[in-house]
């Protein structure tokens, strides 16, 4: 199995909002996220079988990490789009975070 290319969401000004968020986290949280990204790049779709994932709505899914959530859409057999990342606060995704990820997916024509 070949790995997937990861496309992070960028703001209108060109800022990579995913990596900007990650850079503000503790070193331990950063390592956890970079490990997940590395596994996806190496193992492709098989990586998602090993991760704690959950379908949120339609093509929008989330990866649940120890302290954070990454909301994503599988674009095709070769690529995944990371649309939003946030702190885990409750047992489920917060409405504002879900709405933000859905809006970004629509803006990028991923839904």
Predicted regions and their residues:
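Basic, Lys/Arg-enriched alpha-helical interface segments
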Residues: 1-67, 77-79, 87-111
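Short, surface-exposed beta-strand/loop micro-motifs that present aromatic residues
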Residues: 70-73
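Short, conserved beta-strand/beta-arch hydrophobic-aromatic motifs that form part
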Residues: 84
């Amino acid at each position: 199995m070949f790995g997937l290319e990861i496309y992070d969401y960028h703001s209108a000004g060109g800022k990579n909002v995913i990596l900007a968020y990650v850079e503000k986290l503790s070193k331990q949280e950063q390592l956890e996220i970079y490990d997940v990204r590395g596994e996806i790049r190496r193992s492709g779709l098989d990586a998602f079988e090993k991760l704690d994932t959950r379908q949120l709505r339609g093509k929008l899914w989330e990866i649940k990490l120890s302290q954070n959530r990454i909301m994503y859409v599988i674009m095709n057999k070769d690529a995944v789009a990371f649309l939003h990342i946030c702190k885990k606060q409750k047992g489920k995704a917060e409405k504002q975070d879900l709405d933000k990820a859905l809006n970004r997916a629509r803006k990028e024509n991923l839904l």
